[in-house]
Regions:
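Acyl-donor binding region in acyl/amide transferases
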Residues: 83-165, 281-364
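Catalytic cores of nucleotide-enabled group-transfer and carboxylate-activating enzymes in metabolic
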Residues: 14-17, 36-40, 44-48, 55-73, ...
Length: 380
């Protein structure tokens, strides 16, 4: 490491934003497990006017430089909805990538100073930029590429963040299992019981009614997750924005809604691991990769599928009915995933480490933890 000092400067220009996004390619250029994100999506995430998150939040981005070379980046953000749901004075930082400990210390100190100036008394991180984007630092599973919409980090970051005085706030866990040969007599009996119950209907979504289905699912999500740690509601604008991004990877057979007496009470969203389809694009969609990706998405056959979101109406939490609906949705989706999409591995998560209800579902026979992410906190 050079003895030259680290300087921190805010991201101001379009050129700065490009450098901020492109820096990840320098950090992970020799990491075979890293999957380059689509640059257009990262630019959209951090740009006011594109990401509706900025309608209720503000963020500052910085670059760390040494001798004219970029050696780190970070964001700090204040979200009005986080204030409402996680406590007044709660600020966050994220988008954290560095080449060395000196840059890490300087960037974290800078982010903390900005948060204090905004009146924050507590920092959570890394969260990039909200709980619905990429929360947490990967602390287990570095050797395996992340699935769609999950982060990947250098093992050294854990020590750097803890050296800055941060302690664990919460761990987020993902599980994986071989979905080709999954069977369990107890679960099979529960599913059979549900199939005999005429009140229950498990249906696929209808993509031709995409906006209507998206609103239904996200309303269920806001109800099902509202008591969870870290929960912040999605606004109507964010629902539309998320729907637009997710639409190309939504397939009728992979998204299920459970109804009881005609009322939607649970859902499960499963997506192909788009990282398998984009890794060789190196983050670039244009001019030719866009067509290549569209072709791959016509009928994607990925080895891995991910369940990023699953929820059961709050009124059914801790009931036998909740488990029954969950396992019915899992089984019906599993069958189609294997038969129609050629999938062999399923990933559930992320799941809060203390969400016993979801953990009891995710800990299926043969399932194991494949990634663990940690959100840290510190009093300012």
């Amino acid at each position: 490491m050079s003895s030259a000092p680290v300087t921190i400067r805010p991201v101001v220009t379009k050129k700065d934003r490009k450098a901020f996004v492109d820096f990840a390619w320098e950090v992970y250029k020799n990491d075979p497990a890293w999957v380059p994100p689509l640059k257009d999506e990262v630019h959209g995430l951090i740009t006011p006017g594109k990401n509706p998150w900025f309608e209720h939040a503000k963020a500052q981005l910085w670059l760390a430089e040494r001798g004219g070379k970029i050696v780190g980046r970070i964001s700090a953000q204040v979200d009005e909805l986080v204030q409402d749901h996680m406590g007044q004075g709660t600020g966050q930082w994220g988008m954290f990538e560095v080449l060395d400990a000196q840059a890490a210390e300087a960037l974290i100190v800078t982010a903390e100073q900005w948060l204090r100036q905004q009146g924050m008394t507590r920092a959570l991180g890394p969260i990039s930029l909200s709980i619905w984007d990429e929360p947490g630092l990967e602390i287990e599973g570095f050797e395996q590429p992340p699935t769609a919409m999950m982060g990947h980090h250098r093992p050294e970051y854990e020590g750097m963040i803890e050296a800055a005085g941060y302690e664990k706030a919460k761990d987020l866990i993902t599980y994986e299992l071989d979905i080709r040969h999954w069977e369990d007599p107890k679960i099979d009996r529960l599913i059979a019981m549900g199939e005999r119950n005429e009140q229950i209907r498990i249906r696929m979504v209808d993509k031709s009614k995409f906006n209507e289905e998206a609103r239904l699912i996200l309303n269920l999500l806001n109800d099902a997750w509202s008591n969870n740690w870290g929960y912040v509601p999605l606004t109507e604008a964010e629902i539309k924005y998320a729907g637009k991004k997710l639409r190309p990877i939504i397939f009728n057979e992979l998204v299920r809604v459970a109804e009881v007496d005609g009322e939607p009470v649970a859902f499960m969203l499963t997506i192909p691991d788009i990282n398998e389809l984009t890794k060789d694009l190196n983050g670039e969609l244009f001019p030719f990769n866009f067509i290549k990706l569209l072709w791959r998405l016509r009928k994607p056959r990925t080895r891995r599928l991910r369940v990023p979101l699953m929820g059961v109406a709050k009124k059914l939490h801790h009931t036998r009915m909740a488990s029954m609906l969950a396992f019915m949705m899992i089984e019906y989706t599993r069958r189609d995933a294997v038969a129609k999409y050629g999938a062999s591995v399923g990933e559930f998560g992320w799941i809060l480490e203390d969400n016993k209800g979801m953990l009891s579902i995710a800990e299926l026979p043969g399932a194991h933890v494949n990634h663990r992410y940690r959100v840290y906190e510190k009093a300012l």
